[in-house]
Amino acid sequence: MSDHGPVARPAHGAVTQVHGVERLARLDYSPDLDGLADPGEVVWAWVPFEDDPAVGKDRPLLVVGRAGRFLLALMLSSKPHDSADWLDLGSGAWDHDGRPSWLRLDRVYELHENDLRREGAVLAPERFGRVVDALRARGWR
């Protein structure tokens, strides 16, 4: 994961936090390294900071489903978190330094294919299953 400092919101390529998608989105695991982002893949996009949405940074996001023509994704962090809102994913190919990652379960981001900076990796099916279990416990279908 990149630890580069904050940067201003880009004219194109920023993700948007969405609410209430839990009942609309169907969780899906369908990675396909075809150059397009699919559920089960870790991608990178510009994510705004919570305290100042005009500033943010490129972050890894796990694509968990689709809502129409938009992807739905959850943010990863390399900083340890103990809260029930975070799921320990361990390390993966999305982090070149091999650091463990935590997935934020309480914030869903919507992004268009064109908003992606790059694709990172495919999450193993059993790890995606853990994500699905955690999200279904929160009302996802």
Question: Would you name each region that the model predicts?
Answer:
Residues 51-58, 63-95:
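Compact nucleic-acid interaction/catalytic patches
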Residues 49, 78, 107-109:
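Non-catalytic surface loops within mature trypsin-like serine protease
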Residues 26-33, 49:
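Short alpha-helix capping/helix-loop boundary micro-motifs
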Residues 1-17, 92-141:
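C-terminal terminal-subdomain/extension
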